[in-house]
Structure formats: structure tokens, C-alpha cells
A protein has these predicted regions:
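N-terminal carbohydrate-binding accessory modules
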Residues: 29-96, 110-113, 117-120, 391
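Aromatic-lined substrate-binding rim segments of carbohydrate-active enzymes
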Residues: 76-152, 211-226, 325-342, 346
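Extracellular glycoside hydrolase catalytic/binding regions
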Residues: 76-77, 161-163, 168-189, 193-341
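Aromatic-rich peripheral "rim/lid" segments of glycoside hydrolase catalytic domains that contact
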Residues: 323-402
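Low-complexity, acidic Ser/Thr/Pro/Gly-rich terminal tails and inter-domain linkers that flank the onset
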Residues: 400-418
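Short, solvent-exposed loop/turn segments enriched in Ser/Thr/Gly
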Residues: 414-423, 435, 481
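Asparagine-centered strand-capping/turn motif at beta-strand->loop junctions
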Residues: 426-430
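Terminal connector regions
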Residues: 477, 482-507
Length: 507
């Protein structure tokens, strides 16, 4: 193995020298830059990265920091890195992260967190927890949109201000966040206020109610601090007597566009839901679901189709219990389009504890609602750069890995007819630290890994491989880590042997 590497290295050096002679200094061909690099901007209806490549958000909402928990939900059950790894494994590339202005108050202490699963969150403020989530999201190639979801943790507000949290506080908190994350290209945009609705209006001219004017004030204040952010502006609910979902009616943007002081920063955002959330009249139209495209065109799709601005469908979700919900979701995804040129979206929600819709995760906060995920799968583009995967070979460098002493504990967590989830705890029982690891085992039956977390999972026949990620490759002597997966098949067959870096482990 070492000799093979040395031969390849000599050949590579020779080829590099030859290319330099043939093409001259600086002429060696360079790899194409990874999509999603840097800050993003707009061009007509498209989003472009810092290299001018077309990009698209195909993401998910993870709520909780807008509630009195002041942190993303589910951390009472799992680690935040495990959550984000699973999002990446499911091919989401963007995280819409709701928050409340109350989170930044001195008395707002994060709570309902299992610190044995999230030890690095112990003692942190709400903003510091957001820093951790955003930091790791960027490390694994996810982008983040911040969503001012509520002024206080008690509930949604129709207007962007309340008596307790006036407009001045709304704007100053946005300015603070824009400064705080300046230079951090993981955070690409600000969703200014979630779901404005009556008495909010669009284009009415009333400074206390006109959401379009308020969005201009906040958007330009943000851009004065951080000119790189996308400014994401949702609609209202009604325009000229035509009512739609809260935050989804952008009809007024045709006559009254949002005016920003920095060009190519505006993204228009709508929300759309199924009959499980509210029985809108169009769900009972005899032409349903063929009537939906015209409704979407009228309220927000025209902005994309007429090349006015990119559109982000910031929230859409369903329990899928009604057959009309199934038709709605199938039709909506097709309407948004495929590939990098389609309309952006962030599904509501990752969380299973959204009362109207449920989530991508089931109630155990671990297994996936595969029925919902199947509707989204063809449209998900996957994470951008920053995955931390060093490519082929051992992450610690070329050559033969050191001998390993290890213990493995395999535990089935949940099982149902046709599937199960399991976790594998790896303990370094040797005297040397691990700097990157590869775990291998074989299923005794027809089990197939469908997804995994906290490792890069693959399967060939019965043989399963889990490779360390950038954040958990280093394992000190005596330390343990836990990875997990979801699989199809019976949970009764337990792997008999486990190898770590090609060395057998005690099981």
C-alpha cells in the first residue's frame, strides 16, 4: 500500500511537471469550483453563487429557537450534529432556522437540552447555540437562512412589531445578526418576518401597516451592515380583496416592488399549505389539482416565470392523511421544477412536533417519514462543499493504519414491520488515538441501510461500511462515539463481527 502510493505520487509529480512545460507557468488546468461557494446573489429569477454558478435552495425548516426553549427542538433526544448529519444524508442543502427576538434578551435561557448528547452546548446562550448549529452546518456543506419567526416566544404576530418588541428592536436585532455573521458564508440570507397578515398590507402606504415599506427599511438597514446577504421578503395574506395563505400573497409586488439599495439581493418568498392545515376553497374545486398552477402563478409564481426575482417557497407541509394533500404535494413539487434552475424551497418541517403538519422525522425524532421524503427526493440537490470528506484512503494520511483495539456495541433502537433503526457505539480500547476510522460489518440477512447519521454509510451486498466524518474522526484512548442508521428488513439478525480500520473489534 505504501509502495503503491509512492509510485502514484512520482507519476503525479511527473505529470504536473510535464503540464507546466507544455502549457507554461500557471497554465495547469484547475478543477471547476464547487457549486454554492461564498455568498449568493440574484440575476433575474436565478440564484448564483460567488463564482456565478446557478444554485438553488432545496432545504428544510428546523424550528424551536423561536419558542420558549430558545434552541432548536429535539435536542432533548439527540445531538445537534447528528440531526444535521441526517439532514445532509437526506440531500437537503439549506436550513431555514427560525428565531424569536426574545432569544436575545438576557433572561432567555435555553432549556430542554440533553447535555449528555450535546455537551458543547452546556452553559451557552441562545445566540451561542445558533452559532454552534450554524458552524457545524457550514462544516458539512449546508447553507443557512435566518428566519425572524416571532417577536416573542408566545406566538406569531401579524405585523413585524408589537408593543414589547417595536420596529426599532426588530431592525436593531437584524443589524446585530448581520454584523455577528459577517464573513461567515454559511449564512446567506435574512427572512425578515414570518407570515405577515392582516392588518398588514402591501402597497397601501400606511407606515404602520405597509409590509412592503417595512421590508425596505429593514432590508436596507441590514445591507448597510452586511451587503452580502440575500434579503428574503414574504408576502401578505390579502391583496385587493383576494385572500391567500399568510405570507403567501405577493400579487402586490408587481405594482409595488421592494426597493433595496444594493442590487441583486432580493428574494421573494411565499408559504403554501395543504388542506390538513386549512380547507381553502380551491381544494374543493372540481378541477383540483389542475387548478393549483394558476393560483400559484397569480400569487407568487409569476415573479419567477417573468424573470423578476428568485422565489423561495419558505414553508409548505402536510400530514398526507388526506388524498387531496397527496395530490397537492405531488403537483406543487412538479410546479417548482427540477435541477439548479428551479424555484427554491424549504420544507416545513424537520420536526415531528408541528401540530398541523408533522415532520420529516417521525415522533421518535430519529426515523424518517419515508412517504413524505419520497415526494421530495427527486428535487433535492444535496449539500454543497465543506463535507470534510478527504476522498479515498485513510483520513489520517497515506499508508497502513495503526493497529486498533476496539469494542463495538450494536443496539436496535426501534423496529416495525419491514424496517428498524439501530445504533453502533464504538469504543477505542487501545492506547493510541484514532485519526479517522472505517467501521465494517456484514448483515446476516436481507437488511439494507436506507440512511444513516454521524458517519458516511454505504453498502455492497451484505457488507456495510461506515466512515468517520470531519468532526468525529479523532477518538482518544478510552473514548466512545455512537453512529446510527435506518434499514429495511428484519431487526432480528445481528451482525456477528465488526472491523475497525481492518482490525477486528470485541463485540
Amino acid at each position: 500500500m505504501t509502495g503503491s502510493y509512492g509510485t502514484k505520487r512520482i507519476l503525479l509529480l511527473f505529470m504536473a511537471a510535464l503540464l507546466a512545460l507544455v502549457f507554461g507557468p500557471g497554465a495547469v488546468p484547475r478543477a471547476h469550483a464547487a457549486a454554492g461557494t461564498g455568498y449568493w446573489h440574484t440575476s433575474g429569477r436565478q440564484l448564483l453563487d460567488s463564482n456565478g454558478q446557478q444554485v438553488r435552495m432545496t432545504g428544510i425548516n428546523w424550528f424551536g429557537a423561536e419558542t420558549s426553549n430558545f434552541s432548536p427542538h429535539g435536542l432533548w433526544t439527540r445531538g445537534y450534529k447528528s440531526m444535521l448529519d441526517q439532514m445532509k444524508s437526506l440531500k437537503y442543502n439549506t436550513l431555514r432556522l427560525p428565531y424569536t427576538n426574545q432569544l436575545f434578551d438576557s433572561g432567555s435561557a435555553p432549556n430542554s437540552i440533553d447535555y449528555t448528547k450535546n455537551p458543547d452546548l452546556q452553559g451557552l446562550s441562545g445566540l451561542q447555540i445558533l452559532d454552534k448549529v450554524i458552524g457545524y452546518a457550514g462544516q458539512i456543506g449546508l447553507k443557512v437562512v435566518l428566519d425572524r419567526h416571532r417577536p416573542d416566544a408566545g406566538g406569531q404576530s401579524a405585523l413585524w412589531y408589537t408593543d414589547a418588541y417595536p420596529e426599532s428592536r426588530w431592525i436593531s436585532d437584524w443589524e446585530m445578526l448581520a454584523r455577528h455573521y459577517a464573513g461567515n458564508t454559511t449564512v446567506i440570507g435574512a427572512d425578515l418576518h414570518n407570515e405577515p397578515h392582516a392588518p398588514a398590507c402591501w402597497g397601501c402606504g400606511d407606515q404602520t401597516k405597509d409590509w412592503r415599506l417595512a421590508a425596505e427599511r429593514a432590508g436596507n438597514a441590514i445591507l448597510a451592515v452586511n451587503s452580502n446577504w440575500l434579503i428574503i421578503v414574504e408576502g401578505v395574506d390579502g391583496y385587493n380583496g383576494d385572500n391567500y395563505w399568510w405570507g403567501g400573497n405577493l400579487q402586490g409586488a408587481a405594482q409595488y416592488p421592494v426597493r433595496l439599495n444594493v442590487a441583486n439581493r432580493l428574494v421573494c418568498s411565499a408559504h403554501d399549505y395543504a388542506t390538513s392545515v386549512y380547507p381553502q376553497p380551491w381544494f374543493d374545486d372540481p378541477d383540483f389539482p389542475n387548478n393549483l398552477a394558476a393560483i400559484w402563478d397569480k400569487n407568487w409564481g409569476y415573479l419567477y416565470k417573468n424573470n423578476v426575482a428568485p422565489v423561495l417557497l419558505g414553508e409548505f407541509g402536510t400530514t398526507l392523511t388526506d388524498t387531496r394533500d397527496q395530490a397537492w404535494l405531488r403537483t406543487l413539487m412538479a410546479y417548482l421544477g427540477t435541477g439548479a434552475s428551479g424555484m427554491s424551497f424549504t420544507f416545513w418541517s424537520w420536526n415531528p412536533n408541528s401540530g398541523d403538519t408533522g415532520g420529516i422525522l417521525n415522533g421518535d425524532w430519529t426515523t424518517v417519514n419515508t412517504a413524505k421524503q419520497a415526494y421530495l427526493d427527486p428535487y433535492l440537490l444535496g449539500a454543497f462543499d465543506g463535507s470534510g470528506d478527504p476522498g479515498g484512503g485513510d483520513p489520517g494520511g497515506p499508508g497502513t493504519p495503526p493497529a486498533v483495539s476496539c469494542k463495538v456495541a450494536y443496539t436496535v433502537q426501534n423496529s416495525w414491520q419491514g424496517g428498524f433503526t439501530a445504533q453502533v457505539t464504538i469504543t477505542n480500547s487501545g492506547s493510541d488515538p484514532l485519526n479517522g476510522w472505517t467501521l465494517e460489518f456484514a448483515f446476516p440477512g436481507d437488511q439494507k441501510v436506507s440512511q444513516g447519521w454521524s458517519a458516511t454509510w454505504s453498502q455492497s451486498g451484505d457488507d456495510v461500511t461506515a466512515k468517520s466524518m470531519a468532526w468525529n474522526g479523532a477518538v482518544a484512548p478510552g473514548a466512545s462515539l455512537t453512529v446510527g442508521f435506518q434499514a429495511t428488513g428484519s431487526s432480528s439478525g445481528t451482525p456477528a463481527e465488526f472491523d475497525l480500520n481492518d482490525q477486528p473489534c470485541e463485540a
